[in-house]
């Protein structure tokens, strides 16, 4: 049997993780009768992908960073489109990175490409720019959604969309060992552990670290045994390590997910920047306070165009402020300390969050079929429907699968 050929496109680290897991799930489902081509990073390379070019070439930031790299990006756009047309894969699966991926897929449609075009990670039309749903429906065949409430937004405009579950479910966030963490780092069994997560981008880290340090100064007077743990990532590790030296409480900095998830299991509560880590904390059942601070002009624009009331997906999914969000002018040491103190001091407040996030974790797919396997099944189902339609002579130039 001739193996399937799947062309994958990932443009950023989170997409590379999704791509690597999807490739593994496809290989398992097809018992090895599948080949891969496309663009990806180290996780996809581990699964056998030879990337057309370094995935880092597609990293897009602001306008100032984009303009000098525009010739390279246009070259990569041409290169990717040409590679798909030459290889004629059984399907194209693009993963997040919509600025690049959607341009490739639009070019493929204009060139008459007939293979299914599938996009993994639905655009957040429920939060802003709802008109994007109708636009992507013009060139995509299928969407794979991370959140359970997303499919109706796209099905309403005729684009099939499958909820596959959120990748955080496969992160291992709920598999940490708190006792192992305390032993490894010499933390007393009865010490109060607070995980502090100032973010992964330099801009957010530099804005939040001073407030977080001042917050800990307030908490230190109330909790003499307080032990702070600060998981970080390579891009900001040096900045974080330098900042925690002046904090009034002992702080352990960590690199790597395994130690981070053990820290979660050992923690009474967490203080975190808004982002995916809030979902990791939810899966690990760690009560949290979410903080964020951006430029006032950016915030004003955000409030004008964003259609949701919360920044944390837990609150968005529950449609209520279960997890405290302290943003902008509310993101002060006094208010942060008050919110964290409530979690550290009141078991009922912690349990209220744990009960709520347990429901969210179930909605995201925890305890069910792994998201990567669901995604693989959806991709193979789209391909199967296309093959059947081709045999019956019903494929006009694209399918709706």
Swiss-Prot record:
Pfam families according to UniProt: LpxB (PF02684)
One GO MF term: phospholipid binding
Chain segments annotated as transmembrane: none
EC number(s) per entry: 2.4.1.182
Pathway field: Bacterial outer membrane biogenesis; LPS lipid A biosynthesis
Highest taxon listed in the record's lineage: Bacteria
Record's catalysed reaction(s): a lipid X + a UDP-2-N,3-O-bis[(3R)-3-hydroxyacyl]-alpha-D-glucosamine = a lipid A disaccharide + UDP + H(+)
Name of the top EC class for this enzyme: transferase
Entry similarity comment: Belongs to the LpxB family.
HAMAP family, A to Z: LpxB (MF_00392)
Protein name as catalogued: Lipid-A-disaccharide synthase
Organism encoding this protein: Rhodospirillum centenum (strain ATCC 51521 / SW)
């Amino acid at each position: 049997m001739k193996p399937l050929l799947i062309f994958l496109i990932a443009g950023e680290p989170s997409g590379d993780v999704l791509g690597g897991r999807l490739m593994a799930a496809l290989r398992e489902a097809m018992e090895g009768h599948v080949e891969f081509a496309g663009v990806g990073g180290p996780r996809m390379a581990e699964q056998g992908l030879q990337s057309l070019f370094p995935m880092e070439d597609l990293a897009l930031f602001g306008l100032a960073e984009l303009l000098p790299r525009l010739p390279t990006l246009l070259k990569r756009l041409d290169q990717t489109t040409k590679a798909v047309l030459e290889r004629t894969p059984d399907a194209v699966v693009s993963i997040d990175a919509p600025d690049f991926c959607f341009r490739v897929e639009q070019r493929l449609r204009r060139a008459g490409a007939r293979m299914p075009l599938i996009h993994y990670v639905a655009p957040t039309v429920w939060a802003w720019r709802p008109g994007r749903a109708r636009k992507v429906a013009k060139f995509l065949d299928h969407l794979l959604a991370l959140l359970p409430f997303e499919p109706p937004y796209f099905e309403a405009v005729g684009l099939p969309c499958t909820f596959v579950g959120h990748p955080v479910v496969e992160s291992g966030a709920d598999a940490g060992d708190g006792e192992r963490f305390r032993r490894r780092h010499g933390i007393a069994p009865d010490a109060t552990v607070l995980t502090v997560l100032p973010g992964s981008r330099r801009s957010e880290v530099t804005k939040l670290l001073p407030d977080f340090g001042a917050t800990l100064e307030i908490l230190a007077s109330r909790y003499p045994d307080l032990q702070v743990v600060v998981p970080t990532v390579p891009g900001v590790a040096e900045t974080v390590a330098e900042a925690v030296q002046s904090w009034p409480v002992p702080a352990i900095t960590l690199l790597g997910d395994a130690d981070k998830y053990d820290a979660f299991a050992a923690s009474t509560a967490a203080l975190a920047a808004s982002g995916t880590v809030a979902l990791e904390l939810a899966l690990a059942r760690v009560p949290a306070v979410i903080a964020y601070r951006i430029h006032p002009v950016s915030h004003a624009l955000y409030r004008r165009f964003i259609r949701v009331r919360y920044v944390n997906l837990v609150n968005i999914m529950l449609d209520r402020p279960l997890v405290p969000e302290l943003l902008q002018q509310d993101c002060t040491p006094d208010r942060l300390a008050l919110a964290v103190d409530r979690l550290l001091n009141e078991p009922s407040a912690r349990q209220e969050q744990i009960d709520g996030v347990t429901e969210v974790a179930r909605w995201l797919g925890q305890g069910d079929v792994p998201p990567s396997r669901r995604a693989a099944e959806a991709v193979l189902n789209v391909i199967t429907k296309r093959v059947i339609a081709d045999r019956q002579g019903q494929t006009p130039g694209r399918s709706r699968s």
